[in-house]
Amino acid sequence: MVKLLLVGFVVAGIILGTQANEYLDFNVTEIDRIEELEFGFSKYSSNLNPLMVGLTLIRGADSGAVCLDGTLPGYHLHRGHGSGANSWLIQLEGGGWCNNIRTCVYRKTTRRGSSNYMEKQLQFTGILSDKAQENPDFFNWNRVKLRYCDGASFSGDGQNQAAQLQFRGERIWRAAIDDLKANGMRYANQALLSGCSAGGLAAILRCDEFRNLFPGSTKVKCLSDAGLFLDTADVSGGRTIRNLYNGVVELQSVKNNLPRICTNHLDPTSCFFPQNLISQMKTPLFIVNAAYDTWQIQSSIAPTSADPSGFWHDCRLNHGKCTPAQLRFLQGFREQMLRVVKGFSMSRQNGLFINSCFAHCQTERQDTWFADDSPVIRKKAVAIAVGDWYFDRAEVKLVDCPYPCDKSCHNLVFR
């Protein structure tokens, strides 16, 4: 069995799945496996009384806004109140991508490709919590979690009739926005578009478009959590993630829905990488990312396909088992990430929280968003950093010292 352990101040072991090969036998990519493990952990949150929010289906079939299998997409909405009654936070769900017919067909049998399999209620924790002691700046906002069932970060617009696949992420995005505007978002005086992992990438891709939905008087910003996927070589020198993204962009007809400010001078696959977008964006953006992102270590840097000898097997699952040479390689990845955000961080309107943890997605989990023992940089937790930036209380450009200096991390270990 696969166990996910949270190592740091909190240690927990939770059985979550089966061995990697069994996942591959069931036509799910390793990328989806890691997403399932890490998002699955939130179901075992230490929050003893979490807010449960019901699923609302979006009646967008007439416009073609459907999941991979043709079912209706959906979202979870918890209404704001008091000073937050006209403030809106839209959280885009993550969950990997599908880059070929086989993996997309598999997703049709899961919540990542069909609303038939989506949870009818979800816990709202972290940035979605309704408790001031857990979510000090956004607890009373209208908070929405838009479910992810297209496999291309809400960006595709095509179909494959032979496989009965609908690639309609872009239409899902538009139908959801229209539905939320009709439900009061059109009157927002403050708005934040956020997302985790594949949803964090989507928040970057859609950020400027989101800004344009509102009048100039509305305060609009964006937040990407664990969405800074780097166009980097794997341990064999190959381009695992570029090949993956190329498949997604080609299969799902993503090209025409990418920001024109990028596609007017770069190829579409390059424009699916945040590093080619973030410095050109007009809307203020905050990036939260672990410098040693466990998803990228396991699925981009050292996937099993790039490591046939198994030399990286132990290290990719547990940083405590990395050799000095492997740690140097991972330090190089951190340095590449810092180079990518250097120009972006020069803009006063942008914000940054890059901690030296082995983690992935830190805003929806209560223990990493805002708790007594949350990860901190210069004594500032993620929730406080994001709030200070959004409300212009302070300029926030927080970059951690390299591993292993940060003792506040909630590092993930897989066994």
Curated annotation (Swiss-Prot):
Keywords, ordered alphabetically: Cell wall, Cell wall biogenesis/degradation, Glycoprotein, Hydrolase, Secreted, Signal
Glycosylated residues in this chain: N27
Active site: S197, D293, H360
Keyword Secreted: yes
tRNA processing in keyword set: no
Physiological role: Hydrolyzes acetyl esters in homogalacturonan regions of pectin. In type I primary cell wall, galacturonic acid residues of pectin can be acetylated at the O-2 and O-3 positions. Decreasing the degree of acetylation of pectin gels in vitro alters their physical properties.
Family: Belongs to the pectinacetylesterase family.
Protein name: Pectin acetylesterase 12
